[in-house]
C-alpha cells in the first residue's frame, strides 16, 4: 500500500499520542511496510522492539518493526534520510524538531513520497511544531493540547476545518478525543 503521507499528531501528555501511533504501526505492518520508531530515549511503550543504530536504518526490511533512540539525534535523523518503503514514527518530535528545520529533516519531509515513506511526527502543542512542517503536512491529528490553534493560522492549509476540529477536541470532556483533518 503506497500512501506516502506526512502526518502531524498534536497532543499534551497523557492524551493517547503513543497509543494512536501504535495503531498506525499495526496498520503499516499489516500492509507489509517496515516501521522505524525514532526517539531520544528508551520509551517503555516500544521496549519490545529491536534497537538498531543509525547506520543500520538503511537496512530495514519490509515487515520489520525496529526503533532507534539515543542522545545523538543528529546521527539518527541523518540515518532516516536513507529510509525507504516504511512508516517513520517520530515519537516526541517536540524534543528534536523545532525552529528552523535542519537539512536532514527537510530531506526526510520532502523526499518521503519518492522514497515511499509515511511520516508521523508527534508534538505536544501547536507552538512546538515548526511552521514549515504544517505547510507541507498532508494530515493533522488533533488531541488536547491546552494551547490555541490560531497561533498556526497562517501556516495551516485548510484552517477553517482545522479550527472546527480543534474546537471540538478542546470542548470535549474525553481526554483521549481525537480529530483528523486533511491539510493538503
Language-model features: where?
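A short, well-structured beta->alpha microelement
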Residues: 47-81
